[in-house]
Amino acid sequence: MIKKIVSISVCFLLIFLCGCSQESKFGVQQFVERMNSQYGTDFATADFILGTDETKESYLFCEKDEMLISLSLDTNNTIRGVGLLLTESMDINDGLNTFLHICCVFTGESEENQRATLTNCQITAEKIKYADSNFVITVGKFKYSVICNNYSVTLFCDRT
């Protein structure tokens, strides 16, 4: 009887853990669905996703005419990296907030943990400026890259 109870408990625990875990690798459609559901935004419409060629290596989304979000894909059409390009007219804080959100969806981290990671990588409004600078930092399974000049700021997060 005890063996039966233990085995049933283990089954329920496995089902619960599998149901709560977030898939670590996913495609564009899943990324967009997560972005829209987690942040209540219309990151991209279903029509855009359905009308996009699935064999592309990257997808680009414009937001507010000043920000370009890119998703880089591997040969299996799973996302291997996310990027954000800001023009000089874009507020750095707004851009970093959007980068935080796309990194949360991409890495599966909570907003609090991802914000701490970006802060530890010095990807903050105090450090990121429209001036010549660049750096790359690897944290766990992800590499964060920042490229800045007088006209734009480019932020990347890739799987290592």
Which ranges hold each PLM region?
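Positively charged n-region of N-terminal signal peptides that target proteins for export
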Residues: M1-I5
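Repetitive helical segments and hydrophobic/amphipathic motifs
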Residues: F12-L13
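C-terminal motif of bacterial Sec signal peptides marking the signal peptidase cleavage site
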Residues: F16-G19
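Bacterial signal peptide processing site
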Residues: S21-E23
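Intrinsically disordered, low-complexity regions enriched in acidic/Ser/Thr/Pro/Gln residues
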Residues: G27-F43
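Short glycine-rich, low-complexity/disordered patches
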Residues: T41-K56, G108-V139
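Amphipathic N-proximal alpha-helical interface segments
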Residues: D53-L96, A131-T160
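Long, charged/polar, surface-exposed segments that mediate recognition or autoinhibition
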Residues: L73-A125
